[in-house]
Swiss-Prot record:
The protein's name in its UniProt record: Early endosome antigen 1
Localisation per UniProt entry: Cytoplasm; Early endosome membrane
Record's compositionally biased regions (Basic and acidic residues): 481-490
Phosphoserine PTM positions: S52, S70
Pfam families, alphabetized: FYVE (PF01363)
Lineage, uppermost ranks: Eukaryota, Metazoa, Chordata, Craniata, Vertebrata
Amino acid sequence: MLRRILQRTPGRVGSQGSDLDSSATPINTVDVNNESSSEGFICPQCMKSLGSADELFKHYEAVHDAGNDSGHGGESNLALKRDDVTLLRQEVQDLQASLKEEKWYSEELKKELEKYQGLQQQEAKPDGLVTDSSAELQSLEQQLEEAQTENFNIKQMKDLFEQKAAQLATEIADIKSKYDEERSLREAAEQKVTRLTEELNKEATVIQDLKTELLQRPGIEDVAVLKKELVQVQTLMDNMTLERERESEKLKDECKKLQSQYASSEATISQLRSELAKGPQEVAVYVQELQKLKSSVNELTQKNQTLTENLLKKEQDYTKLEEKHNEESVSKKNIQATLHQKDLDCQQLQSRLSASETSLHRIHVELSEKGEATQKLKEELSEVETKYQHLKAEFKQLQQQREEKEQHGLQLQSEINQLHSKLLETERQLGEAHGRLKEQRQLSSEKLMDKEQQVADLQLKLSRLEEQLKEKVTNSTELQHQLDKTKQQHQEQQALQQSTTAKLREAQNDLEQVLRQIGDKDQKIQNLEALLQKSKENISLLEKEREDLYAKIQAGEGETAVLNQLQEKNHTLQEQVTQLTEKLKNQSESHKQAQENLHDQVQEQKAHLRAAQDRVLSLETSVNELNSQLNESKEKVSQLDIQIKAKTELLLSAEAAKTAQRADLQNHLDTAQNALQDKQQELNKITTQLDQVTAKLQDKQEHCSQLESHLKEYKEKYLSLEQKTEELEGQIKKLEADSLEVKASKEQALQDLQQQRQLNTDLELRATELSKQLEMEKEIVSSTRLDLQKKSEALESIKQKLTKQEEEKKILKQDFETLSQETKIQHEELNNRIQTTVTELQKVKMEKEALMTELSTVKDKLSKVSDSLKNSKSEFEKENQKGKAAILDLEKTCKELKHQLQVQMENTLKEQKELKKSLEKEKEASHQLKLELNSMQEQLIQAQNTLKQNEKEEQQLQGNINELKQSSEQKKKQIEALQGELKIAVLQKTELENKLQQQLTQAAQELAAEKEKISVLQNNYEKSQETFKQLQSDFYGRESELLATRQDLKSVEEKLSLAQEDLISNRNQIGNQNKLIQELKTAKATLEQDSAKKEQQLQERCKALQDIQKEKSLKEKELVNEKSKLAEIEEIKCRQEKEITKLNEELKSHKLESIKEITNLKDAKQLLIQQKLELQGKADSLKAAVEQEKRNQQILKDQVKKEEEELKKEFIEKEAKLHSEIKEKEVGMKKHEENEAKLTMQITALNENLGTVKKEWQSSQRRVSELEKQTDDLRGEIAVLEATVQNNQDERRALLERCLKGEGEIEKLQTKVLELQRKLDNTTAAVQELGRENQSLQIKHTQALNRKWAEDNEVQNCMACGKGFSVTVRRHHCRQCGNIFCAECSAKNALTPSSKKPVRVCDACFNDLQG
């Protein structure tokens, strides 16, 4: 086609064709302006010039296809370009074909005129029997003028379409360039975002390291205070170590029990998660079902359009034969029987519809039940919130108890201080050690200074990093602005695409108008063929009349009268012809107006349908977006699970580290306490020995000799004591080393305390946000609180009841072991049951696969049935066409068709019965599967109940445990926090599910409204079709009646020549179309490869997502898939039944049409017989007239015999004249007979040629129908590709939205980081202030401890005002600080910790006590 266009129009059209070819190339880098200047065809990759399009195609396949195959992944972006180019090519080719046909039609009309004029001149007779056919010439000239005007209009349309094609090519090139630019910008932005995220992560790690270093930094004052407190802590730790060892053993046992309980609770939580995960999966299944329904609606609309087109074609073929014979009683009876059968089929379909409605009702009931279950879960969560509030109140009570215990601890510290005064003697010995410690303190202070310098440097680095962060934030804002701009550009491109689609639709409407005009011309051709047949019959009648006239002329009877009669008849016929032509023109104009009105209505309805389809596509995009949201929520849930696991692991590791540190500290404290006890025992022994020695000295002063001996012994003992003191000094050194280790451990403990404080603050913040928790945990917490109350009461009597509790502990351990064994047995039973259910599910899978194989066989059978029906349709059409060609053989072919149709109907009925049986079997199997699934669900419910019972028993066992402390409470709090996070995620899930359900209901309502609109449009369309049929029937009936009067003998030969030329042109067009089909096939193959690769990519992504979700919901997916497959089977069944009913209706209509044709032929035979009888009557009348004339001649002969003698001479002369005239007439008759023989030979040859031409025309029509089918298939594929393009665009939009969401989340995280940094700074400042206050209080406390009662002799003046003491000015001691004051300076009284009543106090102490 492109070669012909280039040959015909070398100027403008050639350039446009090159532009089109250049736009069809898949490379974006070639310029359009350069292509318009180049001659011939240029390869877009190697820029090689070629002579034709075929050479270019071969060159591209041979040279460049290999490279394209290797990088085939990049061709996915070129699918849109190829689709646009193929559409433009098809439009241009259709326009060129229509132009060719109309040119050929105008040329053939000219040829017909010339031939007609030549034949008219040849057949002009000397006798003047045939008159001029001026009216027909005028009509032909009018037709010529109309054809020329139409040709001119079509040329203008062609020019417009070519201009549009050029504009579209330029627009496509611009769009491609914009797309490439945006793609490069997007890639650059993505790279920047990845770099920024990496830098942010690095900076976050640096910030965390700095924070840890800041937390580990101790202050100078802290070190001093800690060193002062070491002695006090040692005494406290000595007393508490024994109790903690015992409690640690108990807590270890309880920890094991709690771990087992925690495992059971995690199992229950996992079950609840799986149950909650069912909800969104079922929603996804329903969304898939909606998508399938939408696809089925689209398929039905496409099928409806194809059927309407086929019906229009068939109606145009058979309306002529249907309207001639309306009085057929047999056909009416058959129609009534078919209507009865259709009523029965409709009843069956209604029953099936009712069954489907019941199934839908069941599904709605199930959804309502699930909604009730979600409401129950919400109620349970509200109950959990109330219980959580109770737990908060109990937690506050426990905090109060803790404060009371701390006060008790302060009292104990006061007692320890009293003991500390007794140990001053030992502190003298430790003075040397303190000197060493001072040196170490100096060293540590120097190290601290160095660390502070390092911290300052790090703070500078932090400030710099913060500035860099601010710069990066500004960069990110700029990137966001760029993304907004790209979004706006994308929206503009979408608007351009919509405008292009509107233009393409306008072009399609124009093409449909052109095709409609071509169809009208085809109908005119068929009418002319009918006129040919009628003209043949008229020729035969005229020949007979001609023979009769010659006979009369030979007889010599009234030549002038005959001529006058013929002239009168000709005048009357001409007048009738003119009147009929005028009527025809009026009716044709009215018919054209009606057709145009109907066409406008049909286009409006099509526009409505397209708008409905666009809405359906928009709904599908919304459903896809909801699916993407669901997937994102699932990914978030999985991330939360991963975070929870990581946090639990961190908690376990921290607990293990804490236990190890506690064990080390306890060991050190044990060793220190043992050493101190040994020293105290030795000191006691020494004191007792000294007392004994003094008593003996007083009693035995007289015995000096004995004393000397005793002194020697004491010297020896003294030496041993010195050795012991040396040993004690070594032990003191060891204690100093132990004290250093204790200091290090204490620093670690302080760091742990700070971390725990931070954790506590985090937990408090979470506790304010969390409002719902599980009932099981609340019961556990309540039981533990009761136990703690009992423990607080029983702490005082623990030392006496240790033995009893150990025995009880052994008994409880035995009970617990027995219970754990029972639970293990129950778990094993549950595992066995689960295994049995898994095996049963595998069996169900096998049965499902068997059902799928049966379904595939059924589908194959259905496809075979449809193929057989199509074949029968094609055979039926062939036989109808043959019946038109050969009228005499119609009866036999109709009988054969009836027999074949009956056989086919029987076969189809049998196959339908078999299909119904197989479908019933499948229904029974599906029912059995449903029953089995219900039984499995009941078993699962029973297993869950047993698990709940086991959990209740475990709760009862937990109530019997009596001793739990701070470690268990911390673990429970952490677990509660984690569970609160889980519940928040569950609430988010439920909210998403509710939103999705609302959106689904809205989508269903919109679909129902659109379906109603489509049904209304279809009803309007059917009504318009009925009116169109009626108008066509009236029009064709009147045309047939008017055209029957025409007697066009000479038009037959001209039309035969036209038909031959038509065949030649059709063959050429078929060859061109075959080439185009091959090109389209290649394009289709490439597109299929692209689509296959895209599908593979999509499948890989789907597999990656499915692998994540398979572990949670395999069983549920299988059940839902089976349900959806059953629904699909039912839908397929309904579709097949509808198609079968449609095919039956078409077969019945074909039958009725064939019967009508037979009756028409019979009527035509009867008309011919009547005409024969009329001619025979005329011949008999002529014979009677001849006999009468013979009688008259005999009478005249008798008279002539009398006058013979008189008139012999005259008679002889007249006879001679007559003989000469008769000879001349015989010669003329012989010539006329020879001409008639020649004409008959020519007519027979033409008839034979006409038969062959008709056969070839029928074959060409078949080929044309096949080509139309192929074009329809290609259009369907183009529509599918457009849908894929739209899906790709929707995916791109979704990705952009995800990017924007991710950026928004990044901004939120940045804000959160800044808030957390501020909180951290505030908390660190608060901790530092608390430390300073603690230090000041400790200093004051140490000062208060170090105060002494001042002696009267030492103080002679008031220590406040400086007055001197005398007899009148007395001394007064302050009962708080112990200093001496005058009466005025110590006039105030206040309560002190050491007295219950107010006591004399100085002004300074009074202010301190009250401040």
